[in-house]
Amino acid sequence: MEKSKGQMKSRLSYAAGAFGNDVFYATLSTYFIMFVTTHLFNTGDPKQNSHYVLLITNIISILRILEVFIDPLIGNMIDNTNTKYGKFKPWVVGGGIISSITLLLLFTDLGGLNKTNPFLYLVLFGIIYLVMDVFYSIKDIGFWSMIPALSLDSHEREKMATFARIGSTIGANIVGVAIMPIVLFFSMTNNSGSGDKSGWFWFAFIVALIGVITSIAVGIGTREVESKIRDNNEKTSLKQVFKVLGQNDQLMWLSLGYWFYGLGINTLNALQLYYFTFILGDSGKYSILYGLNTVVGLVSVSLFPTLADKFNRKRLFYGCIAVMLGGIGIFSIAGTSLPIILTAAELFFIPQPLVFLVVFMIISDSVEYGQWKTGHRDESLTLSVRPLIDKLGGAMSNWLVSTFAVAAGMTTGASASTITTHQQFIFKLGMFAFPAATMLIGAFIVARKITLTEARHAKIVEELEHRFSVATSENEVKANVVSLVTPTTGYLVDLSSVNDEHFASGSMGKGFAIKPTDGAVFAPISGTIRQILPTRHAVGIESEDGVIVLIHVGIGTVKLNGEGFISYVEQGDRVEVGQKLLEFWSPIIEKNGLDDTVLVTVTNSEKFSAFHLEQKVGEKVEALSEVITFKKGE
């Protein structure tokens, strides 16, 4: 009971942290630029205002690109941290507090310096923005790196990630719901629906307060688990990231396509508030849009597994792009009709979480593709590519948003009534034509260059399994006699009779099979986990004597991509005989027309001259019963 309460406290605290993290990020990446373009400078000269706005935007873009080069240093700094409070929590709490305070400063004119001494203001703005950005990165990297440190249980990690995803989704969308009501409530003047500096300051104050409170909640409510397998992590450099990109063509082309896609959607998303303020003329209605987005986003994510199974990822991706382009087309002619605007905006928004998940899954699959192609596994480096692309795209889209807003006259003092037809046309080119073009470029790259389908990935994983067996078949064995116990309860099957060519032929090593009656899989020998596939259906263990044992649950189960499997171990873990390794659910395997037979082999069985089954084929054997003995010749 105490453990359950502790886990729930940790999940809720981590979800709160994700909520605060995305409230902060949405404010910084989408809404801060609105404050800069419409409220920060009011010199009385529109050209001078636009000049300063573009200078500020250039500073922001340069600093955000610079952050890409700083991030690996931050990651290595966090990796080398060792305090009594843990590795990550000090950075999450400290980074959250400092970044929140500096964000609040950015929503001010620094005591009127922007008027009395614009040059000094720009210098101080750059310094404060850099401090804010660096400490937000420290918090962000530390926060999202915490999950492996909060539990060694794969199942608990998945629950933790689910809680975080919910908190993140709500946080990202609730800002859109609340921003204009808060800004207008605290503003002294309405300014045609865009509020004033006072309103934006108090909005930033609330965001900063949420950032501080949720960061502290993570520090108090979570507990990092000590484990030797978390020590000596490989350090990541930007050079290594680009090296991995160069060696992994699927990752490289997907990253390029995703960058073009992200540039388009980030630009359009950030310009929506401008549309509601300067085209529709009612910024308060923007809350309705993001209220819908919050609900629709959660539903969209929940439908992903079903849609991916029915259409496959690439078809789902193309379908999403088509729906989004349709939404852009309708949005471009919606004018001031709120029902049409909301319909178009939702058509554009609904597929976005699905596209993100498609891209994330292909990037995850490219880990095995890269391993298959180069012979070494670069998991952390491969997965670090997406955040890198997001940041580069975000920096560019911020610059574009500012440029389009200035070109359309949507700066300090502007309102829907002052925007001319020509300026509306320029704005719509930036908001609709440009994103549509970049999304089409991204989709074209994916269509022409991405060949890593689910089926191909399954074959690659099977090939990696085979390579593991071949690579370890020559491992020297110190012991003369080795006995294995059954990893699960079921009926003993002759390995040569199973419906898998590699296992039946003995090319994966000698061993046995079990037709299971239970879903728990235990270690048949003591040793170290040398391989645990991301699909969680196979585990490789090396004993202290050099014996390599492969436990493979099911035939063709790689196609399930982990569905129906729970892993309790990680690569590098030390396990004892009888320790639970996996759990699987046979109904899911059978529902997909697959065989749930558990296959067990000694991949370096060639080092033994003989083996003997201690149980009769066809008879039921209990888990952890002695089942096979390998012997060397005299």
Curated annotation (Swiss-Prot):
Ranges of residues in domain PTS EIIA type-1: 500-604
Cellular localisation: Cell membrane
GO CC, one annotated term: plasma membrane
TM annotation in the entry: 16-36, 54-74, 91-111, 118-138, 166-186, 200-220, 251-271, 288-308, 316-336, 340-360, 399-419, 425-445
Gene Ontology molecular function, alphabetical: kinase activity; symporter activity
EC primary class: transferase
Superkingdom of the organism of origin: Bacteria
SUPFAM superfamilies (UniProt xref): Duplicated hybrid motif, MFS general substrate transporter
Modification sites for Phosphohistidine: 552
Topological category with respect to the lipid bilayer: Multi-pass membrane protein
Entry's Gene Ontology BP terms: phosphoenolpyruvate-dependent sugar phosphotransferase system; sodium ion transport
Region of interest (Permease), residue spans: 1-490
Keyword annotations: Cell membrane, Kinase, Membrane, Phosphoprotein, Sugar transport, Symport, Transferase, Transmembrane, Transmembrane helix, Transport
Keyword Hydrolase set for record: no
EC number of this enzyme: 2.7.1.-
Comment, domains: The PTS EIIA type-1 domain may serve a regulatory function, through its phosphorylation activity.
Function description: Responsible for transport of beta-galactosides into the cell, with the concomitant uptake of protons (symport system), and also for transport of homologous and heterologous exchange of beta-galactosides.
Record family assignment: In the N-terminal section; belongs to the sodium:galactoside symporter (TC 2.A.2) family.
Official protein name in the record: Lactose permease
Organism whose genome encodes this protein: Streptococcus thermophilus
Organismal lineage: Bacteria, Bacillati, Bacillota, Bacilli, Lactobacillales
